[in-house]
Structures are given as C-alpha cells and as structure tokens.
Amino acid sequence: MKTTFDRISGMTSEQRDKLTEQFDKASRVAGAEPIAVVGIGCRLPGGVTGPESYWELLESGTSAVTEVPADRWDAEAYYDPDLTAPGRMPTKWGAYLNDIAGFDADFFGITPREAAAMDPQQRVLLEVAWEALENAGLAPDQLGESRTAVMMGVYYTEYQNSSAGNPDTIDAYSATGNAHSVTVGRISYLLGLKGPAVAVDTACSSSLVSIHLACQSLRMRESDLALAGGVSLNLRPETQLALAKWGMLSPHGKCFAFDSRADGFVRGEGAGVVVLKRLTDAVRDGDRVLGVVRGSAVNQDGRSNGLTAPNAPSQRDVITRALRSADVPAASVNFIETHGTGTGLGDPIEFDALAAVYGRGDAPCALGAVKTNMGHLEGAAGVAGFIKTVLTLQHGTIPPNLNFEKWNPTIDPSATRLFVPTEAAEWPKSDNPRRGAVSSFGSSVVVGCGRGAT
C-alpha cells in the first residue's frame, strides 16, 4: 500500500499545484467559519456602563476627555509645557472611568483583604465579563464545567508599581493580585470554566488579538463559547510621563485623527468584553446575534523602520489576509474603525495601507476613530473599536469622528472612496449585508451584520 508520501512524491508538478490549491481552499473554508457576537459588556470613559450608553456617546459625538482626576495623580505637579523639563510632561488630560474603587468582593466570594491586593484591572474586568454574559442572556453561575474560553488583553501593571516604595504593604495576595495570567484565570476559576484562559499582551492591539484567538479557538472546537476583550487603567503618572517624553501625547489634550493638526494621542482607559459563539450554534440555541466575525488576521512588522513605528507593507498584508480569511471583497466594506491615533507618523502610514486595500469601489467607506471620543485605551483599544463597529452595524448609522477639519497634508484621499465622517450619517444603501472592519496595528478583523447576518 502506498503511503501519502509516496503518492505525493509520484505526482507531477501540475498535480502538486492542483493539490496545493485544494488544500488552500479547504483551509480558507475552515478559517472562515462565521463567529457570532452574542453578548457585549463595557465600562468606558464618559459614564459608559454598557452598549446602550456607549452608543449614545458615539452617536451624539461626545468627548469624554477631561483633566486627570485628583484621585489618580496631581496633574498640575507633573505639568510643564516644556517637553524637556525633567519629571514633567506637556499634557494633563485623559479619559477616565467614573469609579474604579467600587467592587462587590462578597458577590464574587472574594475576601476584603484579597480584593484590596487585586489590581483594579482584575476587578473591573471580572465585573464586565459577568455583565457581558448577562447581556448574552446567559447565567454566569450556570456555566461551570463548560468549554468556555477566556482570552483577554492586558498591558501595563501600574498597580503593582504602587507598592514598590512601600514593601510593608506586600502580602501573599500581591502576587496573584497583579499577575496578568491571574487577571484572566480568575474569571475561569470563579465561573468554573474549562476552556483555555490566555492573557494577551501585544501592546495596543492586545484586545483585538484576543478576539482573533478566541475565534480561532471556537473554529478549532477547542471551546464552545468564548469571552474576549481587554482592560486598561491609568493609575500612576510614570507611564504617561514616559509616553510624553517619546512625543506620543498631544499637548492639546485632543486626538486629531487624520487631521492636519495631528500631534499625538490622549490616553484613555476602560474595559470591554464580547461573548462569542459559532454562528451555527448560536442559531441552534436561539441566541440574539449582534454581529458576525467573518475573518481576522494577525502579523508583526519584523525588522522595519523602528521598534515602535508602524509599517505600511505589514499593514497591507494583515488587512489583505483578514479579508481573505473572511472571503469577502474589500469593496463590500463600508466602515472601518481605524487605529487612528492622531500622530503625524502613524496616520499617513495607516491611511496608505487602508487605501491600498479598501480604496477602490463605488460605495463610500467611512474611517472611524473612537480615540477622538475617549483617547487611546491601549490594552483595551481594540475591543472598544470592535464593539463600536458592532453597534454601528446594528444601528445602521455611522457615528461622527471628533476633531477633524482638514486632512493631514501628507494624506491624499482624492483617488479613493475613503472619508472621515464629521456628523452622524445613515449607512450607505445597498442590497448587500452591512460589513465593517476593525484595524489595529498588527491585527485586523472583518465584522458583518444585516441580511443573512453575514
């Protein structure tokens, strides 16, 4: 009996090419299995406590940026318009949650002592994960023993740094209270979930990569339900000071995405969690389908023009592969939630990549940027953009970007269908389902909703 190796070895070059095409087609079909979004939970700046209040903020074009609250740090003590001033920064703005101290530890069976040692990111994410499950119509305490995955983006560890100068405050709970792995694992532990639990740190794309990994886990039958998203809280001035010294932060306290005034971003914070399920299972179980993930992709720049600098060819590649994974044409996408940091370097590079892939077509395509509303949520930025995209698809309305007057002079949109929405507008009329995309440096996701939920 001939082995597979023998059969392939005996093939002609033409036969091997044909077999490769068949394998490639089969892998694309498997990778394009649609994943339903069945629940959403979020805590975001501007008093956002869920998808309804988030949509109100977006549709009304509200800015959630304020001066740094006194319970974080003394903004005036660290402020100096001179970027070179040691220990000072030319910004005192950000976008913050109203309350990060309130936590019902008893509800989750956590002692007050352990709760005090927990990074507020752990506390907030645990609450938002619970709320997302409730939004999905699921009883969180009834999921024990289920193959439910938890994939969350977590970035900085500023709470742990608070103990650096006061070792007397460190106890046994300080280790578990500050570990990224426990931020995710605690959700699985408290709910008794048996699927994979993974903490993801890919910097600003962390939460979008988490969604990508959760979709892959569902497609591979590694899990039957997944919680995906991320959290980021700005607790201390040191990180903000370092970013300011890089020249990344706007001295005006605004994010001018794609605008001629782009001079950096504003830091924001928050948490977002989506509940994901294979579409076939969601339909079978009668779940409310809020949106459908058709495909996604992740890559890395490799050795390029700088460790922290974006790379246009890599961006084009990841967007192209996400569309290929989704098996949908670029021209069918009418809304892209961009990375849109409002930096003189990043915006033109991102626009060039988007224009190369999405620029051609008849129907206009809007470039959204929620960072203009609430700053850069860093580890939670991707999920904030993802939830915005799902809500935009649901409501059939494209919300406005803020702080846009005139294109960055190094961007030329004239030969493309891309535009920046400056007021709320109806979704372009079409017989096709609504489709949107989310772009974050290093990852891209294609989301759909509407007729046929595709």
Question: Model-found features: residue ranges?
Answer:
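N-terminal acidic, proline/glycine-rich, low-complexity intrinsically disordered segments
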Residues: 1-7
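Condensing-enzyme catalytic core of the thiolase-fold
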Residues: 10, 15, 21-454
